[in-house]
């Protein structure tokens, strides 16, 4: 973050938009922090500096962060990620603590890329290289210059950033990527290398140059030249078309040889710096980001490669705090919200945010869905509702006057909506609302919780409440589990019920994790109508090893269990084996589920259940009950004892 005055990208961290973003510079307005800053601050959102049509080139959110030395309301970076892949320009990435800024931009490939540059500067990326990387990603042609600026500011790889700038000018995206590489190299020479690459036109080549000292040479026209420095190799590869530079000097020979390498963005994987080159070539901004990170960055870059923009941000993070920003949204960087950085909102960006948003969307999507992962040090709200305004913590509350009072803000965009505090020509939906992740899935997480101004008291939180207590219907997930069980149970044809219908046997299922047990329980409910399941509960602690103090008899552990009541012991044995075989092959928490058979000598008198009246109004919510609890023909037996 050296002071670099307003910075170079299209946006000058003050919130102004310079009109990079389109006709109605939708938000700008000077120092007023709301806008520019979270942008500059790191949470850049891709939107140009503040508002900006989503697609606008916008200076990425990474512009120098108010270079007057004061970090405006230090908004914990929580960049929602460079939207890269989907969504507008995706510049924002910068978020990461330090360097993040740069990386993010790159990923976004933000229109101008310039943004990336700015971000880099600001970030100064802990890694330093990060800054450059960002620019590279976004660099795409125009942005290049910006990239340079950022790098300089970052001071990150020394001249590395500058190198990036050069790359941008020359070949656009690739060039930028190269720059990132330079950052990684950090060596002054590295920076130069990047510049050279740009000249060549093989932006990727530039990246190679970045490689450590060798960079100088490598960056130069020849991807191979990059060989000089390990990172250089990568860059060189890029130039060749083979981000492969993977092998340091090898770059030229190995990845370089294959144009494919670069495209893949795999190059990034190969060797940090290489990654950068590769990313650029591919267009996988992420790759670039990685390069900046140097070694660390690479990992991030990889994710980016997948998702694209987000990844870049991550790369920066690699270097330092940036990670969070990088994660940006999703699992990988891709921008989904996935679990990780890329996805989008997901579990935590590259290292940065580990949040728990529910990522709910399964799969990559885990990306955004997970909810805006709460960032470092941001505890999740304690109570489901209460927090009327946003489930954030005090520091992130917008200044009182400035909060538009209408539209709910989509969680996760926290207050970065509408810098002017009102509809300023933007759609009424905060920029991130759309990619919010699967709407169909209410689970957990602030998302359905309190909306900005409360949502009319319609509901408190998503989840299964709503269905009758203790009753869940089926859903694809549970159906799949049930299917697996049915197949395994098909092996044992034994009586599952008895005439007297006494619940004398049971299967005690425990361990694994709460979620894995819960899912298994729902699956069993679907697969075996003849059983009755208790809700999940917790086991007490057993003995403390050694002579010391023992736990109190009531002390609950976090290990859960549930009991399956059955009418025949023989079926209990069969079910136990089926469950064992079902969970064993599965990955971690699930395979640790333990099962044992129990027998209740006098039987357990489960309370009788009377089917709801069909015609009466009373049936209103109850008639669904037999979906999973009843109607299987053995009802009569329950009350018979």
From Swiss-Prot:
Signal peptide residues on this chain, from the entry's feature table: none
Any one of the GO CC terms: host cell nucleus
Record's comment on post-translational modification: Phosphorylation at Ser-385 increases the nuclear import efficiency of EBNA1.
Region (Chromosome-tethering GR1): 40-67
Residues under site feature: Interaction dimer-dimer: 491, 581
Residues covered by region (Interaction with host CSNK2B): 387-395
Record-listed E.C. numbers: 3.1.21.-
Keywords: Activator, Covalent protein-DNA linkage, DNA-binding, Endonuclease, Host nucleus, Host-virus interaction, Hydrolase, Inhibition of host NF-kappa-B by virus, Nuclease, Phosphoprotein, Transcription, Transcription regulation, Viral latency, Viral latency initiation and maintenance
Active site: 518 (for site-specific dna cleavage activity)
Keyword Ribonucleoprotein: no
Residues annotated to bind DNA: 460-461, 518
Region described as Interaction with host C1QBP/P32: spans on this chain: 40-60, 325-376
Residue segments, region UR1: 65-89
Region described as Nuclear localization signal: spans on this chain: 379-386
Cell compartment(s), UniProt: Host nucleus
Modification Phosphoserine, positions: 385, 393
Low complexity compositional bias, start-end: 22-32, 383-394
Function (record text): Responsible for the origin of replication (oriP) dependent replication and maintenance of viral episomes during latent infection. EBNA1 dimer interacts with the DS (dyad symmetry) element within the origin of replication oriP and with a host mitotic chromosome to initiate viral DNA replication during latency. EBNA1 binding to DS recruits the host origin recognition complex (ORC). Governs the faithful mitotic segregation of the viral episomes by binding both the FR (family of repeats) element within oriP and the host mitotic chromosomes.
Record text on subunit structure and interactions: Homodimer. Dimers can assemble into higher-order oligomers like a homohexamer. Binding to the DS element involves 2 dimers of EBNA1. Interacts with human USP7; this interaction is independent and simultaneous to EBNA1 interaction with CSNK2B as well as necessary for PML nuclear bodies disruption by EBNA1. Interacts with host CSNK2B (via KSSR motif); the interaction requires phosphorylation of EBNA1, is independent and simultaneous to EBNA1 interaction with USP7 as well as necessary for PML nuclear bodies disruption by EBNA1. EBNA1, USP7 and CSNK2B form a ternary complex.
Family to which this protein belongs: Belongs to the herpesviridae EBNA1 family.
Additional record remark: EBNA1 is possibly linked to multiple sclerosis in the host. Antibodies that recognize both EBNA1 and the host protein HEPACAM/GlialCAM can be produced when B cells undergo somatic hypermutations. A mimicry has also been proposed between ANO2 (Anoctamin 2) and EBNA1.
Name the UniProt record assigns to this protein: Epstein-Barr nuclear antigen 1
Taxonomic placement: Viruses, Duplodnaviria, Heunggongvirae, Peploviricota, Herviviricetes
Encoding gene (name): EBNA1
């Amino acid at each position: 973050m050296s002071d670099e005055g307003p910075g170079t990208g299209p946006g000058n961290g003050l919130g102004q938009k310079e009109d990079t973003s389109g006709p109605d510079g939708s938000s700008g307005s000077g120092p007023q922090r709301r806008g520019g800053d979270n942008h500059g601050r790191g949470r850049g959102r891709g939107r140009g500096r503040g508002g900006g049509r989503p697609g606008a080139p916008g200076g990425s959110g990474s512009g120098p962060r108010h270079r007057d030395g004061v970090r405006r309301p230090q908004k914990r970076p929580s960049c929602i990620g460079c939207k890269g892949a989907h969504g507008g320009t995706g510049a924002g990435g910068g978020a990461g603590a330090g360097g993040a800024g740069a990386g993010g931009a790159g990923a976004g490939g933000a229109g101008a890329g310039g943004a990336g540059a700015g971000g880099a500067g600001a970030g100064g990326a802990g890694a330093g290289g990060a800054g450059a990387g960002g620019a590279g990603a976004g660099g795409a042609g125009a942005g290049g210059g910006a990239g340079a600026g950022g790098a300089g500011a970052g001071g990150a790889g020394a001249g590395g950033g500058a190198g990036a700038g050069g790359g941008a000018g020359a070949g656009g995206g690739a060039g930028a990527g190269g720059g990132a590489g330079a950052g990684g190299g950090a060596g002054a020479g590295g920076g130069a290398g990047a510049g050279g690459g740009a000249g060549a036109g093989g932006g990727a080549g530039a990246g190679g140059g970045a490689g450590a000292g060798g960079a100088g040479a490598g960056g130069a026209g020849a991807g191979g030249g990059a060989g000089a420095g390990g990172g250089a190799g990568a860059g060189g590869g890029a130039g060749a078309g083979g981000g492969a530079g993977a092998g340091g000097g090898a770059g030229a020979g190995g990845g370089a040889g294959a144009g494919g390498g670069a495209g893949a963005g795999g190059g990034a994987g190969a060797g940090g710096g290489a990654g950068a080159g590769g990313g650029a070539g591919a267009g996988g901004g992420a790759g670039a980001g990685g390069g900046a990170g140097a070694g660390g960055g690479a990992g991030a870059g990889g994710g980016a490669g997948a998702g694209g923009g987000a990844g870049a941000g991550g790369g920066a993070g690699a270097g330092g705090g940036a990670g969070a920003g990088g994660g940006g949204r999703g699992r990988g960087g891709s921008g989904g919200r996935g679990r990780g950085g890329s996805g989008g909102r997901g579990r935590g960006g590259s290292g940065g945010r580990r949040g728990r948003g529910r990522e709910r969307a399964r799969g990559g999507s885990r990306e955004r869905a997970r909810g805006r992962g709460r960032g470092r040090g941001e505890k999740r709200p304690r109570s489901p509702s209460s927090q009327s305004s946003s489930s954030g913590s005090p520091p992130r509350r917008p200044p009182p006057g400035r909060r538009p009072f209408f539209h709910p803000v989509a969680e996760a965009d926290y207050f970065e909506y509408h810098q002017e505090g009102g509809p300023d020509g933007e759609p009424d939906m905060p920029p991130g609302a759309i990619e919010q992740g699967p709407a169909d899935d209410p689970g957990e997480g602030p998302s359905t919780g309190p909306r900005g101004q409360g949502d009319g008291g319609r509901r408190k939180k998503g989840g299964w409440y709503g269905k009758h207590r203790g009753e869940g219907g089926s859903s694809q997930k549970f159906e799949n589990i049930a299917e697996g069980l049915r197949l395994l149970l098909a092996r044992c044809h034994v009586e599952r019920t008895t005439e007297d219908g006494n619940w004398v046997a049971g299967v005690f299922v425990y361990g694994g994790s709460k979620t894995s047990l819960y899912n298994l329980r729902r699956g069993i409910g679907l697969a075996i109508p003849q059983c009755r399941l208790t809700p999940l509960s917790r086991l007490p602690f057993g003995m403390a090893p050694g002579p010391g103090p023992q736990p109190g008899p009531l002390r609950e552990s976090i290990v859960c269990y549930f009991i399956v009541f059955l009418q025949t012991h023989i079926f209990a044995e069969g079910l136990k084996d089926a469950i064992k075989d079902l969970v064993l092959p599965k990955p971690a928490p699930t395979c640790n589920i333990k099962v044992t058979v129990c027998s209740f000598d006098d039987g357990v008198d489960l309370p009788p259940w009377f089917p709801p009246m069909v015609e009466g109004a009373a049936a209103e919510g109850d008639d669904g009950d037999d979906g999973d609890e009843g109607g299987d023909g053995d009802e009569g037996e329950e009350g018979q004892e």
